[in-house]
Structure formats: structure tokens, C-alpha cells
Swiss-Prot record:
Role noted for this protein: Protein-lysine methyltransferase that selectively catalyzes the trimethylation of EEF1A at 'Lys-79'.
UniProtKB keywords: Cytoplasm, Methyltransferase, Transferase
Family as reported in the entry's similarity comment: Belongs to the class I-like SAM-binding methyltransferase superfamily. EFM5 family.
Annotated source species: Gallus gallus
Major enzyme class: transferase
Protein name, entry field: EEF1A lysine methyltransferase 1
Coiled-coil portions: none
Location in the cell: Cytoplasm
Record-level GO BP terms: peptidyl-lysine methylation
Keyword Nucleotide-binding: no
Primary localization class, coarse: cytoplasm
Listed PANTHER family: EEF1A LYSINE METHYLTRANSFERASE 1
A GO cellular-component term linked to this record: cytoplasm
Tree of life domain: Eukaryota
Length: 213
């Protein structure tokens, strides 16, 4: 038997360091869950699944978007988070009885949030439960999972069905023209950040006078 290990693929030192950092972060999060009591609504309580193109917002960005949604919805308003689970989590973490919120999401891990979770596949944009009536939400916050016009166009069908008018869209800067085309939204000065740096520049878009400029 040949004992030569030359043919075994070796990870680079940079990749090994990144993996070690990732596993250390996981261990630290698990430790926090057990030692401090687990907050199921904290951003990151459900791990990102990169295969589903999941990248959570930073805590600061999630708070900013949640607060914007609350103000835009108004007292007693209804907020829909479409493929934007970290905004939903921040809304629920902050609490408050002056609004209601639901999460439309493909990832069934978020079903832990009970009746507020609605399974959603952008490929079937209008395949929604009967109780989700058209134009029944004061604002829709959406973050389409992929930077493609097809994904944006289909998600836009859902957004336009749900919203009474107000839209807060988060997607790549490269989607500015398509966002205006399909949803009539304009880019904001506010720049959203993610907990892990992404290669693509992200921006927010709205169709109303927001606090993000």
C-alpha cells in the first residue's frame, strides 16, 4: 500500500483559519444559549444556510429596518417580512403590541415561530394561504434570495399582492433598474450591512417617504 499523502487534497492555511473561526463562533453561540438563556428571536439564533442564499443582517441594520417598518406601518399596523427573517426576528425581539407581523420564508426551520410563519416559495409567488388577503399589509419588507431579475420579478408579484402600498426592498445595488421597473421603488441613502461581509453591494429601496434617507 502506498503511504504517500501527496495526492490527498490539503486546505490552505487561510481556509483552515476561516474554518477554525467559524467553528469557534458556533461553539461560542452554543455556550451563550446554555449560559445566558436562549432568545429564540435574536438575529442569528437560527444559523445561516448559505445553500439557501441566507446572509443575516448585522444587528444594527436589522434594528434600523425593523424600526423603519414599525414607523411606516403606523399604530396597529400589519407588517409582512418576505424572505427577510432577521427583520422579523428583530421586530419580535423588540416586542410591542402596536403592530402585528408575519414571516414568509422558504426555510421551514422558521416554523418554530408558529402561526406567524408562512411557507413561501418565490417560484410560486401567489401560492399563499387564504387568510392572507390582498392588500392587507401596511408595509412589506422583502429581501429576495437571489440577485436575478426572475427572482425579483416573482417576489414582486407577492409584494404587490400583499401591500396596501408601502414597500421596503433590500437587494443588490446592481438590481436598481429592475427594482424600479417591477416595483417603482427608489434607492435610499442608508446602506444595509450583513453580519458577514458580502461581495455584492447591498442597498435599500422604497416607494414612500422613509427615514432611510
Amino acid at each position: 500500500m502506498d503511504d504517500d499523502d501527496d495526492d490527498i487534497p490539503q486546505l490552505s492555511s487561510h481556509t483552515l483559519a476561516a474554518l477554525q473561526e467559524f467553528y469557534l463562533e458556533q461553539q461560542q453561540r452554543e455556550g451563550m444559549k446554555t449560559s445566558q438563556g436562549f432568545n429564540q428571536y435574536s438575529v442569528g439564533s437560527i444559523e445561516e444556510d448559505w445553500q439557501l442564499s441566507q446572509f443575516w443582517y448585522s444587528d444594527e441594520t436589522a434594528s434600523c429596518l425593523a424600526n423603519e417598518a414599525i414607523v411606516a406601518a403606523g399604530k396597529g399596523g400589519r407588517i409582512a417580512c418576505v424572505s427577510a427573517p432577521s427583520v422579523y426576528q428583530k421586530l419580535r425581539e423588540q416586542g410591542g403590541a402596536d403592530f402585528s407581523v408575519c414571516i414568509l420564508e422558504y426555510d421551514r426551520r422558521f416554523s418554530v415561530y408558529g402561526e406567524e410563519f408562512i411557507f413561501y416559495d418565490y417560484n410560486n409567488p401567489l401560492n399563499l394561504p387564504e387568510h392572507l388577503l390582498p392588500h392587507s399589509f401596511d408595509i412589506v419588507v422583502a429581501d429576495p434570495p437571489y440577485l436575478s431579475e426572475e427572482c425579483l420579478q416573482k417576489t414582486a408579484e407577492t409584494i404587490k399582492y400583499l401591500t396596501k402600498g408601502k414597500i421596503l426592498l433590500c437587494t443588490g445595488a446592481i438590481m436598481e433598474e429592475q427594482a424600479a421597473k417591477h416595483l417603482g421603488v427608489k434607492i435610499c441613502k442608508f446602506i444595509p450591512k450583513h453580519s458577514r461581509n458580502l461581495a455584492n453591494e447591498f442597498r435599500c429601496y422604497v416607494n414612500y417617504a422613509s427615514g432611510l434617507d
